[in-house]
C-alpha cells in the first residue's frame, strides 16, 4: 500500500447467499470469485455476463470497486449494469444498504452507482445484490482472418448495421 494506507482483504466474505431463479437475482458477499459465481448461475440457467480477464481469480467486490467489464461488455454492459443494491460500511463505521431487489429504484440519490467504481474510497462493500439474465440458448464462436485492418473494421460495422450485437 501507499505509505499510510491499508490493505483490507475481503477474501473470507465468500458466500453465495442466494441465487433466486424466479426473479433473476443473486445475493453474494464480495469475496466470491467471479468464475465460481458465473458457474453457479449457469447451473441454474442464469447468466452473469461481466467477464474480466481475471475472472478465475478476481473477487466480485473488486470488480465492483473498479467497475470491471471484459469482452462481453460490447453486448451486455459492465459490472455496474448488473448491481441492484449493496450493503456497505462507511468510513464512520455506519452500515448502509443502497438500492434494493427491484429492477427500477428511483427513490433518492443513487448511492449504489456512486460506490461502484470508487475503488474502496467511499465504502467497503460487504454484500451485493445482482441482476441476472437468462443463459443464452446458443453460443457460437467465429474466428475470421482479414488481409487488412480496414476490411475488419468494415466487417464489424456491417455486423452491427444488420442488428447483430456480438458478445465480444
List where the protein language model places each region.
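Glycine-rich N-terminal segment of FAD-binding domains in flavoprotein oxidoreductases
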Residues: 1-13, 28, 49
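FAD-binding subdomain of flavoenzyme oxidoreductases
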Residues: 15-167
